[in-house]
Amino acid sequence: DRSRGLGDVYKRQRNIRLALLEADVSLEVAKDFVNKIKPKALGQEIIRSTSPGQMVVKIVNDELINLLGSENTDLNFNAVPPVSMMMVGLQGSGKTTTTAKLAKFIEKNKKKKVMVVSLDIYRPAAQEQLKLLGEQHNINTLPIIEGQQPADICRRALSAASLNGSEVILFDTAGRTQIDLQMMSEIKQIEEIINPVETILVADSLTGQVAANVAKEFKNTVNLSGIVLTRSDG
């Protein structure tokens, strides 16, 4: 009956809100999400259904798809080559590995010659790590010059790409253990030099609300165009 159907729907809504909070989703986002599904979940056809709980699950699934984006958006290559793309994120997010994987994807699926460039002069062996990953994936890597600053590496990369025929340059920026003023100032300077068509944030999905806060900080500093969530298979 109607009262039983309503009870089932309200119970599901409470469970959904609790599940989101336990998954480290912020209270604001959890409330907003439940409020979005509430009008549909309380619709007459749902209440009168023989299985209102299952119909609520479908509504939640549809809303999650809508929230995350129901359409695939391709990378933007709409610029005069070499096209620059900037990878940003905190240290340990998997940014360098993602940079190499993205380079391989572009070469294989988009048939474009890619060069990867490490701007991380702070983390020990960070530049060597990208060089090794480039060799493993057969991707061209900008040669390392010890002591060169990120801004100068950017300018050298742009010149090198024009000479070696690279159509896309992926710049792997330095990460930090936490966001600080120096980091953001450096990334802003890099953005001004390379004028990237894509600025992609790489974030660890297991950090929960931290990832959302990091995204806000980067969005306030640079023209963030996309996000890659690592470790999302767990």
Label each region the model flagged.
Residues 22-88, 93, 97-214, 222-225:
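Nucleotide-state-sensitive switch-loop elements of NTP-binding domains
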Residues 1-10:
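Single conserved hydrophobic/aromatic residue that forms the stacking wall/gate
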Residues 12-20, 36:
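A general alpha-helix detector
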Residues 233-234:
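Canonical P-loop GTPase G-domain recognition
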Residues 230:
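Phosphate-centric recognition/catalysis
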